[in-house]
Swiss-Prot record:
Other information: Involved in the renal transport of a variety of drugs with well-known nephrotoxic potential, therefore may play a role in the etiology of the drug-associated nephrotoxicity. Uptakes the diagnostic agent PAH/para-aminohippurate and clinically used drugs. Mediates the bidirectional transport of PAH/para-aminohippurate.
Designated name of the protein: Solute carrier family 22 member 6
Domain free text: Multiple cysteine residues are necessary for proper targeting to the plasma membrane.
InterPro entries: MFS_dom (IPR020846), MFS_sugar_transport-like (IPR005828), MFS_trans_sf (IPR036259), Orgcat_transp/SVOP (IPR004749)
Catalyzed reactions per annotation: (6R)-L-erythro-5,6,7,8-tetrahydrobiopterin(out) + a dicarboxylate(in) = (6R)-L-erythro-5,6,7,8-tetrahydrobiopterin(in) + a dicarboxylate(out); L-erythro-7,8-dihydrobiopterin(out) + a dicarboxylate(in) = L-erythro-7,8-dihydrobiopterin(in) + a dicarboxylate(out); L-sepiapterin(out) + a dicarboxylate(in) = L-sepiapterin(in) + a dicarboxylate(out); prostaglandin F2alpha(out) + a dicarboxylate(in) = prostaglandin F2alpha(in) + a dicarboxylate(out)
Gene that produces this protein: SLC22A6
Known role: Secondary active transporter that functions as a Na(+)-independent organic anion (OA)/dicarboxylate antiporter where the uptake of one molecule of OA into the cell is coupled with an efflux of one molecule of intracellular dicarboxylate such as 2-oxoglutarate or glutarate. Mediates the uptake of OA across the basolateral side of proximal tubule epithelial cells, thereby contributing to the renal elimination of endogenous OA from the systemic circulation into the urine.
């Protein structure tokens, strides 16, 4: 009897699965908020230099006398006159406004608080020479996500999914709350890094715990549900950020609910599959019988015994012996080729994705509106992506998604700043293509790697995505050279990566490889068993989507 048969015996998709899946998925609403909350908590309002403390504005001719103008006729953000400049304003940077000696803002800045009453930028003056620190905060958060994926992924295999989830909920609640009360910028960054670590663990173990309690034929549906819940979280963030504009209050609001998640997570039932893989048949039996009672299948649960479990576990133990290490990806030429090509695709997708979603202020429209639009475009993008990869194939879908995304971003770099409608439309289209690229790369990676190293390959791909999300905020610092430089870089990387897809084989309609030998000889028709395996198992890999990237 296979493990899937055991799940069917204790109720399949019963009351227990419905309750636990709902409770495990619920925190993902706020996970999306944590990933991109810095668009609001680190927003940069309009600002200009504060006059000297001893300045007499009424005598000097008002604040305008201290502010030089830029080429657009707006007050300079990072310079002031060393002495007041009398006379009419000179919006074109001529005469007094163009010849007066200037100096940095040694007395601080005055911010326009009409949209954002308080952000980490205004509180700690992360502008001008300190502007790079704003992006550093987001990069450190992504470093935490990278570390969390490695640390908590390992701990979940050692300690169990439930225990690690409980720890992650508590860590997110505590670190997120502490970040809201951080007295200075370094401490804020430290707590954000810890939040990134724990949220990566939540994303990883949420998916694992849910699918390990679901029958095969429902796992793709659960994965799709998880993806759409994450997208819904992007809508939620826009509304919450609009209602709560103060950065400390917003940070607190998206963190405190994790205390509730921590409390109810104690009632989760540990994965019986994990118990069995750890050799704890007694705990496996106890968990299955408990689920049977909740699902109203008490009599079926009573029929289970240690002997039945041993028979079911035998195949899993045999498959477990065939697992390969990550080093196998580099030792074997065929796997090394896949690893290098797929790493480029993972990196490019995540790099460009976070380059777009973490620069909402750069499109010249309401930051709240574009947050909603960016969340909404995921819905049709995921649907269109699903249809394309199942009709035209994985390789052309992956190539088209990256190529179109890159072209849209590159075009955005040459569109004038005042054309906000065109720039926003291109950004939304590019973001939708990158969402489709995330869908495709999860699926494509799962189909390319053989069973013996499939999970390891997916894990390494996810790691490269984390690297892309870490580097992406740092690239935005190149705006100091020229405003469109980041967009040219964000666009060029996916365009270049799209060419890599021609080096990969097509997997549409092909049986899943179990060994490297299968990979090297992808020929022959699929057996009915292989067709079922591909139909239900592969979409599971795709369902993680960009939330793990995130």
């Amino acid at each position: 009897m296979a493990f899937n048969d055991l799940l069917q015996q204790v109720g399949g998709v019963g009351r227990f699965q419905q309750i636990q899946v709902t409770l495990v998925v619920l925190p993902l609403l706020l996970m999306a908020s944590h990933n991109t909350v810095q668009n609001f908590t680190a927003a940069i309002p309009t600002h200009h230099c504060r006059p000297p403390a001893n300045a007499n504005l009424s005598k000097d001719g008002g604040l305008e006398a201290w502010l030089p103008r830029d080429r657009q006729g707006q007050p300079e953000s990072c310079l002031r006159f060393t002495s007041p400049q009398w006379g009419p304003p000179f919006p074109n940077g001529t005469e007094a406004n163009g010849t007066g000696a200037t100096e940095p803002c040694t007395d601080g800045w005055i911010y326009d608080n009409s949209t954002f009453p308080s952000t980490i930028v205004t509180e700690w003056d992360l502008v001008c020479s300190h502007r790079a620190l704003r992006q550093l905060a987001q990069s450190l958060y992504m470093v935490g996500v990278l570390l969390g994926a490695m640390v908590f992924g390992y701990l979940a295999d050692r300690l169990g999914r439930r225990k690690v989830l409980i720890l992650n909920y508590l860590q997110t609640a505590v670190s997120g709350t502490c970040a809201a009360f951080a007295p200075n910028f370094p401490i804020y960054c430290a707590f954000r890094l810890l939040s990134g670590m724990s949220l990566a663990g939540i994303a990883l173990n949420c998916m694992t715990l849910n699918v390990e309690w679901m029958p095969i034929h429902t796992r793709a549906c659960v994965g799709t549900l998880i993806g759409y819940v994450y997208s819904l979280g992007q809508f939620l963030l826009a509304g919450v950020a609009y209602a709560v504009p103060h950065w400390r209050h917003l940070q607190l609001l998206i963190s405190v609910p994790f205390f509730a998640f921590f409390i109810y997570s104690w009632f989760f039932i540990e994965s019986a599959r994990w118990h069995s893989s750890s050799g704890r048949l007694d705990l496996t039996l106890r968990a299955l019988q408990r689920v049977a009672r909740i699902n109203g299948k008490r009599e079926e649960g009573a029929k289970l015994s240690m002997e039945v479990l041993r028979a079911s576990l035998q195949k899993e133990l045999t498959m477990g012996k065939g697992q390969a290490s990550a080093m196998e990806l580099l030792r074997c030429p065929t796997l090394r080729h896949l690893f290098l090509c797929l790493s480029m695709l993972w990196f490019a997708t995540s790099f460009a994705y976070y380059g777009l979603v973490m620069d909402l202020q750069g499109f010249g429209v309401s930051i709240y509106l574009i947050q909603v639009i960016f969340g909404a475009v995921d819905l049709p993008a995921k649907l269109v992506g699903f249809l394309v990869i199942n009709s035209l194939g994985r390789r052309p879908a992956q190539m088209a998604a990256l190529l179109l995304a890159g072209i849209c971003i590159l075009l955005n770099g040459v569109v004038p700043q005042d054309q906000s409608v065109i720039r926003t439309s291109l950004a939304v289209l590019g973001k939708g293509c990158l969402a489709a690229s995330f869908n495709c790369i999860f699926l494509y990676t799962g189909e390319l790697y053989p069973t013996m190293i499939r999970q390891t390959g997916l894990g390494m791909g996810s790691t490269m995505a984390r690297v892309g999300s870490i580097v992406s905020p740092l690239v935005s610092m190149t705006t100091e050279l020229y405003p469109s430089v980041p967009l040219f870089i964000y666009g060029a990387v996916p365009v270049a990566a799209s060419a890599v897809t021609v080096l990969l084989p097509e997997t549409l309609g092909q049986p899943l490889p179990d060994t490297v030998q299968d990979l090297e000889s992808r020929k022959g028709k699929q057996t009915p068993q292989q067709q079922e395996h591909q139909k239900y198992m592969v979409p599971l890999q795709a369902s993680a989507q960009e939330k793990n990237g995130l």
